Regions:
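Amphipathic alpha-helical dimerization/coiled-coil segments
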Residues: 1-5, 9, 78-103
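Charged, low-complexity, helix/coiled-coil-prone segments
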Residues: 1-4, 13-14, 68
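N-terminal helix-turn-helix DNA-binding core of bacterial DNA-binding proteins
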Residues: 9-15, 20-49, 55, 71-81
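Single-residue recognition of alpha-helix boundary sites
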Residues: 33, 64, 86-88
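Short, intrinsically disordered/low-complexity patches at protein termini
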Residues: 48-50, 59-60, 87-89
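Beta-hairpin "wing" of winged helix-turn-helix
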Residues: 59-68, 75
Length: 103
């Protein structure tokens, strides 16, 4: 990778996921869309903390949100994530991929 812009974008994505709870959120969203309350219960983390981490992931365009009634549900952004097989989800960084294995 010699393009400084591409390197900067990649570093920003890696920085956004470089926190254990954010990795756990990504893992939870791998199975489908969820709202903040659902994620907080699954992760046993305070809602305010989940909201903060979702904000960071949303800012990096790793997750997307959609209003459904009274709730906002979050899902993985297909621009960065893909399921090429049933065995794993991949975060595509352009020059490399990070594998999130299915449990």
């Amino acid at each position: 990778m010699t393009d400084p812009k591409q390197a900067k974008e990649c570093a920003e994505l890696l920085q956004a996921i470089a926190e254990p709870n954010r990795i756990r959120i990504i893992e939870c969203l791998r199975t489908g869309s969820k709202n903040v309350t659902e994620l907080a219960k699954l992760l046993n983390v305070e809602i305010v903390n989940v909201s903060h981490h979702l904000g960071v992931l949303r800012q990096a365009q790793l997750v997307q949100d959609e209003k459904q009634g009274r709730f906002v549900v979050y899902s993985l952004n297909p621009k960065h994530f893909n399921n090429e097989s049933t065995k794993a989800t991949f975060l595509d960084l352009g020059w490399c991929r990070i594998e999130i294995p299915h449990n």
